[in-house]
Amino acid sequence: MQMDHKQVMRALPHSYPFLLVDKVTECIPGECIVAVKNVTFNEPFFVGHFPGNPIMPGVLIVEALAQASMLCVVCDADGESTGDTSVLFMSIDSARFRKVVVPGDVLVLKSSVCHRRGNSCRFDCRAYVEDVLVTEAQILAMMNK
């Protein structure tokens, strides 16, 4: 399953400038997802992070991974939100920032459900630029119906 930016905007509760997923290139709902964030110089966070040396803040890379993870569990096989589930993030574990992300990079976000118990779900997340691992983390979320 794939999703364009309009489907992403309908499925996520976020809006600009905090919407950090541009499209979904692959998804098996409830199992795994591959999404894309095109990092442009016009991102508002580059104004102060850092003047003359713009670097995407690591916490925003993790947020992009969290948004992709949310799409994985709230969308059906047609790429539309099921509308009956909200996702609240509970913790970020084992976050590692391996390389910087700069304007012009295409951030590929990969997330897989690695464990479910009750209404909680743990995701194994990785972000890549040109097939190079830049960030990894485990995200724990609670799903409310």
Swiss-Prot record:
Database matches in InterPro entries = FabA_FabZ (IPR013114), FabZ (IPR010084), HotDog_dom_sf (IPR029069)
Q: Enumerate the active-site residues.
A: 49
What EC number(s) does the entry state?
4.2.1.59
The reaction(s) annotated as catalysed by this protein in its Swiss-Prot or TrEMBL entry are:
a (3R)-hydroxyacyl-[ACP] = a (2E)-enoyl-[ACP] + H2O
> What one GO molecular function would you report for this record?
(3R)-hydroxyacyl-[acyl-carrier-protein] dehydratase activity
Q: Does the keyword Cytoplasm apply?
A: yes
Sequence similarity: Belongs to the thioester dehydratase family. FabZ subfamily.
HAMAP family assigned: FabZ
Name the chain's protein.
Answer: 3-hydroxyacyl-[acyl-carrier-protein] dehydratase FabZ
- What lineage is this protein's organism placed in? Bacteria, Pseudomonadati, Pseudomonadota, Alphaproteobacteria, Rickettsiales
